[in-house]
């Protein structure tokens, strides 16, 4: 195992999978082409390429939460710079078995060294993926329960409810961030869905775990149907 770059750490290699920072445009293009949402998240600012045998086979993008100030309601004393969300992840099937959890683990080791101000990482498994977060379980994230969010489906794409409720005078709407303008201009055709999201947290600084305001819960089983849990 090795950390690349001196004095600035730029990646992490576990001997099988390597991650290193890549240009935002490169990462965004891969996500748009391959991620199930086909949409980027503009608040992502850590863009990591995933390499197997020297070949770029995937991307992980970390950044702010949709509500950056929400961290303190999850872990007491959290400032915006103290936590990240895994906003987007895509790996090619040729990356191999267990590549997702390995890539996440490598990315966490990298972030811990490169961004020491980050104390915890949060991610959500989306019910649309039908797996309830088994990748995060394999990467030793802890599970903190589920909640239901409203999504809107338009022409085969899903949009978070926040994009339906944004003011038409807001910058996000005018710039069509997250497809807000597209969604609202076509709201009569949009289909409403209520979908569960499963919250996972990884504490990079174990001392911060005691500050968590949520109760850790047993992992949901990925093979259970939605009505069973």
Describe each PLM feature range:
Residues 31, 44-64:
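Conserved beta-hairpin
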Residues 171, 208-214:
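Hydrophobic helices that insert into or interface with lipid environments
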Residues 213-229:
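Short, cationic low-complexity segments
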Residues 37-45, 53, 67-72:
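An active-site-proximal beta-strand-loop segment
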Residues 21, 63-190:
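Acyl-donor binding region in acyl/amide transferases
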Residues 2-42:
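Short amphipathic alpha-helix that is part of the acyltransferase structural core
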Residues 45, 195-200:
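Short hydrophobic/aromatic beta-strand or adjacent loop that forms the aromatic wall/cage
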Residues 15, 54-60, 81-84:
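Glycine-rich phosphate/pyrophosphate-binding loop shared by adenosine-nucleotide-utilizing enzymes
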């Amino acid at each position: 195992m090795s950390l690349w770059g001196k004095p600035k750490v730029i990646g992490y290699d576990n001997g099988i999978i390597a991650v290193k920072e890549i240009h935002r445009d490169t990462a965004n293009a891969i996500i748009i082409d391959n991620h199930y949402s086909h949409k980027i998240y503009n608040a992502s600012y850590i863009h990591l390429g995933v390499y197997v045998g020297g070949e770029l086979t995937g991307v992980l993008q970390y950044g702010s939460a949709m509500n950056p100030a929400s961290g303190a309601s999850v872990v007491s004393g959290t400032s915006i710079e103290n936590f990240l969300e895994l906003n987007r992840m895509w790996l090619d099937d040729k990356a191999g078995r267990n590549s997702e959890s390995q890539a996440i683990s490598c990315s966490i080791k990298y972030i811990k060294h490169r961004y020491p101000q980050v104390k915890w990482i949060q991610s959500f498994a989306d019910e649309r993926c039908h797996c309830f977060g088994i990748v995060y379980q394999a990467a030793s994230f802890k599970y903190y329960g589920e909640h239901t969010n409203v999504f809107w489906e338009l022409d085969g794409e899903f949009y978070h409810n926040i994009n339906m409720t944004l003011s038409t005078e807001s910058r996000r709407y005018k710039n069509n961030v997250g497809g807000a303008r597209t969604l609202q201009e076509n709201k009569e055709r949009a289909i409403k869905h209520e979908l569960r999201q499963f919250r996972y947290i990884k504490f990079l600084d174990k001392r911060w775990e005691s500050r968590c305001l949520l109760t850790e819960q047993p992992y949901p089983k990925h093979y259970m149907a939605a009505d069973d849990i």
